Amino acid sequence: MREPLALVLGEDDIRALVPHPAWDTNKYARGTVGVVGGSAAYPGAPVLAASAAARCGAGYVRLVTTSGATACAHAHLLSIPVSACDQGIWGTLCATSAIQAAQDLAKSDVILVGPGMGTSDDSERFLEALSQDRPMVFDADALTLIARNHGLLDMPARHPRILTPHEGEAARLLGRKIANRNEDALQLARDYEATVVLKGPETLVATPLG
């Protein structure tokens, strides 16, 4: 395996990566994003994520959350459709709601799962039942669930996936404290067959190849 190559990206580099759609591009051609999360305790987390997806240029964003969290979503998301799914006794998504979620996310090119979804047993069963049949982004509580049960991720990976841990979540995924951010981000990428975005004062992005 070749040695990892490290690059430092500045504002100009990031700006060059932002796509500029043609004037006649429709919303579906600009990419569709499904956001899954939220619970009775954290109804606002997926709202922030869905808003961010829209602001980043996604043509169509849909939020899938619990029935108890929809009021918060409707109050803050004026142009993003919100789907309500069954919730378990802890006020989180549950295994039966995965079927509803799959139907609502059928047109999504990529799915972000995790913000505010909680770490209850119901949350774990939901994540286990959620199909990983397209590119996926795992964030927040989804990472804690994966650290607790590595079997929640399809292995080998069938589609591209991204993990977005902060150092605490990264430590849980590794099963030890972070010793070297560069090396540990690469280790995570290889262990989980994913692109890893290790957040911090200087965010690191690592792939299994470097």
Q: Model regions: which residues?
A:
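Small-residue (G/A/S/T)-rich helix-start motifs and N-terminal tracts that mark the onset
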Residues: 1-135, 144-162, 167, 171-210
